[in-house]
Amino acid sequence: CKNVTIKGIIIDDSNDWSMRITGCDDVNISDVKIFGCRGNSDGIDICGSRNVTVSDIFTRVWDDSFVVKALGTGNCENIIFKNSVLWNDFARTMEVGVELRADKVRNIKFENIDIIHSDTGYPLMGIHHGDHARVSDITFKNIRIEDAPGAQLFDIRIADSVWNRDKAMGDIRNITFSDIEYIGTNDSGILLSNS
């Protein structure tokens, strides 16, 4: 698909990933509200797509809110998630991975995001990689976190998992975290690993 606009919709109680954009170019998603209470009810998954802007989103989901993956449908490049509010009952709020089956996953930005709830031990900002892609130029900027008892602030790792298919593992480089503010009452642990 090319030149796609998705605006002003509500997705309620999906039984799988609520919105999956796969193998597309030049996509704009805005003013979307997503409510999911089932396992696997991700918010928005951008998979092997290029030039995608996701803005002004509210998610309250049981699984991951914003995810970038590459499922063998081409490189994933120039993706921005911005100006959004995330509530997670389980899993990750912002994630690059786990499935990264492409040559390049690069220039991915998460900017001006409010995390208002996440009460599991999962990382709020994660990069999990076990396939062959070169992952680079990932930015988490201007992120505000309200309460996230037990959550990890961020987790970056290269490791094998049940979701990976490639035998060779790629690398991760040029990751930026800036203007991250935690205003909750819980001291979250911080995990950085490269396994």
Language-model regions, residue ranges each:
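Internal alpha/beta core interface subdomains
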Residues: 1-33
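All-beta strand scaffolds that present successive hydrophobic residues in beta-strands
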Residues: 4-7, 27-31, 51-55, 76-82, ...
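Non-cytosolic beta-sheet module surface loops
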Residues: 9-10, 57-58, 85, 129, ...
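Conserved beta-strand/loop scaffold segments within soluble protein domains that form the structured core
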Residues: 14, 68, 74, 80-82, ...
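Short glycine/acidic-rich loop motifs that flank beta-strands on beta-rich extracellular proteins
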Residues: 15-21, 37-47, 51, 59-70, ...
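Active-site-proximal loop/turn and secondary-structure-junction residues that shape catalytic pockets
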Residues: 23, 33, 70-72, 98-100, ...
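Extracellular beta-rich repeat passengers
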Residues: 118-195
